[in-house]
From Swiss-Prot:
Protein name according to UniProt: Pyridoxine/pyridoxamine 5'-phosphate oxidase
Residues annotated for FMN binding in this entry: 61-66, 76-77, 82-83, 105, 140-141, 185, 195
Entry note: cofactor: Binds 1 FMN per subunit.
UniProt keyword terms in alphabetical order: Flavoprotein, FMN, Oxidoreductase, Pyridoxine biosynthesis
Protein family according to the UniProt entry: Belongs to the pyridoxamine 5'-phosphate oxidase family.
Amino acid sequence: MKIDLTSLRHEFTQSGLNRADLSSNPFEQFKLWFQQAQEANVVEPSAMSLATSDDSEISIRVVLLKYFDRHGFVFFTNYNSKKSKQLQINPNVALLFPWLALERQIKISGYVKKVNTFESLKYFSSRPKASQLGAWASQQSSNLSSRQILLSQFESMKVKFSKGEVPLPDFWGGYRVIPSKIEFWQGRENRLHDRFIYQLSEDKWRIERLAP
């Protein structure tokens, strides 16, 4: 079966991006665009596609950015998940923020390091208790014969941790994506898009315009 989508076309007309408008610091530029995405009520602006790979396979999924600073971009996950197993083999990753409502996207390339236990505990403690229990209940990426098994595991965790605080699982925590390249893309008319890439070289960020 073939479905022809060639007639689907959207002209990008919202705005442009000039070199003079860019911060010399890519994290400051990301902060500005992220704030603008929030102000524009972009759905889940913190949602980002995370691409990982091992020796034989490339995988991609959506995860949530939890915070960022000049050191990198942090997300949390199960350390026994498929993504984590791939990261043990190959720490190089790519992120993509597709803010289509603003005709923008941000692409980030770099590598990951695990955050320390204190950072993981601080974030885990801020989560709703049901989410904490879910982290304990789910053996992420393992096979499930039915949803009922997952729900039963969740109920078991509710009983197990019915009193007191839910502890941080030793198989759960954060990764920090430390970027070497950050690209800002703004859609333009006639597919002549504006693209600027920040590349880290000798501890300094170099900015270049890219052809669309």
